[in-house]
Swiss-Prot record:
First-tier enzyme category under EC: hydrolase
Gene name for this UniProt entry: dtd
Pfam families named in the record: Tyr_Deacylase
Species, as recorded: Bacillus amyloliquefaciens
Record's protein name: D-aminoacyl-tRNA deacylase
Function of the molecule: An aminoacyl-tRNA editing enzyme that deacylates mischarged D-aminoacyl-tRNAs. Also deacylates mischarged glycyl-tRNA(Ala), protecting cells against glycine mischarging by AlaRS. Acts via tRNA-based rather than protein-based catalysis; rejects L-amino acids rather than detecting D-amino acids in the active site. By recycling D-aminoacyl-tRNA to D-amino acids and free tRNA molecules, this enzyme counteracts the toxicity associated with the formation of D-aminoacyl-tRNA entities in vivo and helps enforce protein L-homochirality.
């Protein structure tokens, strides 16, 4: 699994003009699933993201986690994270999991986050979505369960 993680002051996702998910301070996570991913990958990244110390303490140092701050997560599925651009001019998405496999792991990922006590908002899997966010910092990280 791959994630693009952004620390945000707010974020929302809209589908067909209607807000599907909206959060205040927390993390906006774009979530990609590949063929070899398992529930262990989802569990590893769920634990990592809620404990990742990317929020400022009273001294302005990144010492606090999402759990420490009571922040929220906006989780948006994005198969394009597995796009290959080495050859040609059009991305190749062969490394992205098939939709049925990706949906199961994406839903498991969100469930694991909720089990950790985090409020999770989502987009709509497979839909064309508009994502709005205010990146705080900016802080943006790429996480991969295989690396």
């Amino acid at each position: 699994m791959k994630l693009v993680v952004q620390r945000v002051t707010d974020a929302s996702v809209t589908v067909d003009g209607a807000v599907a998910g909206r959060i205040g301070p927390g993390i906006m996570a774009l979530v990609g699933v590949t063929h070899e991913d398992t529930e262990e990958d989802a569990a590893y990244l769920a634990d990592k993201i809620v404990n990742l110390r990317i929020f400022d303490d009273e001294s302005g140092k990144m010492n606090l986690s999402l759990l420490d701050t009571g922040g929220e997560i906006l989780s948006v599925s994005q198969f394009t994270l597995y796009g290959e651009t080495k050859k040609g001019r059009r991305p190749n998405f062969m490394n992205a999991a098939k939709p049925d496999q990706a949906l199961l792991l994406y839903e498991k990922w969100n469930e694991l986050l909720r089990e950790k006590g985090v409020k999770v908002e989502t987009g709509i899997f497979g839909a064309m979505m508009d994502v709005q966010l205010t990146n705080s910092g900016p802080v943006t990280l790429i996480m991969d369960s295989k690396q």
